[in-house]
Amino acid sequence: MNLSLREIQKLLVTVAADVARRRLARGLKLNYSEAVALITDHVVEGARDGKLVADLMQSAREVLRVDQVMEGVDTMVGIIQVEVTFPDGTKLVSVHSPIYK
């Protein structure tokens, strides 16, 4: 199986997001990398489902609450930018203050 660098990066985000979901289900708080992966995966999968950029920017801010991440993670994650392929082309989705307070 030959994967491009972009495909490898997508797979890594997906795996990290899956780990984050399992840790949340066990009641554990997420670290920076897990939180970013989970929100990024939400945006990528939402685009794949055909959602609009504006809808994804809003819904991504509701994926995690401050009580679900380790102390300080909410301030470390000021913005998440994801380049995503939509049916009408590739777009940059920016999610400001992605962890719900």
From Swiss-Prot:
GO molecular function of the protein, one example?
A: urease activity
Gene Ontology cellular-component annotations: cytoplasm
What pathway or pathways are given for this protein in its record?
A: Nitrogen metabolism; urea degradation; CO(2) and NH(3) from urea (urease route): step 1/1
According to the UniProt entry, what is the EC number of this protein? 3.5.1.5
> Is RNA-binding tagged as a keyword?
no
| Keywords in alphabetical order | Cytoplasm, Hydrolase
- Going by the record, the broad EC class of this enzyme is hydrolase
Q: Does the keyword Hydrolase apply?
A: yes
Organism domain of life:
Bacteria
Q: What reaction gets catalysed by this protein? A: urea + 2 H2O + H(+) = hydrogencarbonate + 2 NH4(+)
Subcellular location per the Swiss-Prot or TrEMBL entry? Cytoplasm
| Subunit and interaction comment | Heterotrimer of UreA (gamma), UreB (beta) and UreC (alpha) subunits. Three heterotrimers associate to form the active enzyme.
PANTHER family from the UniProt entry: UREASE
Q: Which HAMAP family would you find in this protein's record?
A: Urease_gamma
What is the protein name for this chain?
Urease subunit gamma
The source organism is Ureaplasma urealyticum
**Lineage of source species:** Bacteria, Bacillati, Mycoplasmatota, Mycoplasmoidales, Mycoplasmoidaceae
Q: Its gene?
A: ureA
